[in-house]
């Protein structure tokens, strides 16, 4: 799977454009100077793992936490996002926790799975409405960033790829008529 194809799939799945997509296409470049306030703590990574696990929970396949999506998000935000989007992402983590406190009376980390799902569903609707009226100069919605990074991190991870797709590590000859039955995994 090529990077462009993945970006198209993530954009279609989240109903918008991929935030920072031009940087992903060009390749991420680490900055020599770390932007003030963008360091992620172990607690931040655990928080992002829980957000990602709520979006892609463990079922018969690995969940986002098992794929270490929280760690993936931190690398992508620090190395690939512009400073404005980094700031939005960090502030968004706080906003998400505050929204959980407002909706359920406790932090996201203490919330039950049903409360987490309810919160993220409402944030997803909010993000979609925001994107309908967003102007180019407006900041991106923090939840859309988290959701896109969750999908990208999960489906490019080893457990996400191998357990959800018919992954063939060594390419064979081209066969344009591979038999496919409903319910089979996609070939990648």
Indicate where each model-derived feature is located.
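C-terminal segment of N-terminal export signals and the immediately downstream linker at the start
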Residues: 1, 5, 21-55
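N-terminal export signals
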Residues: 7-27, 112
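Post-signal-peptide N-terminal segment of Sec-exported extracytoplasmic proteins
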Residues: 44-75
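Structural motif
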Residues: 40-46, 63-64, 135-142
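Membrane-interface junctions
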Residues: 9-12, 54, 79
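A ubiquitous short alpha-helical element
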Residues: 34-39, 56-58, 78-89
